[in-house]
């Protein structure tokens, strides 16, 4: 019986798994969290029927994407130049430009306009593809983790800049 109790006690101890042992640094976890939140918003958009609801949610999506791309372009991408393959960073900038153009097109439309929903759907697919490329093995995040940058310290700066931009850009949006 003592052996059984010992086994029970031993198995009750929390085990450290590879996943918990390799937690992402703050910069990467913050950006991945943004990817998940925006993906959830696009999923929610698909369920909406009313124009007012669609417009309100799209405005949230656009704000989140504008802030996310800006913090990546101001902090992550320039500081990872030399740590991450130039081609990956160049492609990321081009993908951001394409997303910004599509966001501007959608912002100039009304939800009742032809192709509005289609453009939002394509933007969601475009963003999902971009996020997948950043997160995949060999992608920007993977290469950044192998570099010399302090990604936890960078994460603090990304977080602070994100908060600042959210406040600034939210204040500019008409309610």
Where are these regions (language model features)?
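Small-residue-biased structural context
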Residues: 2-175
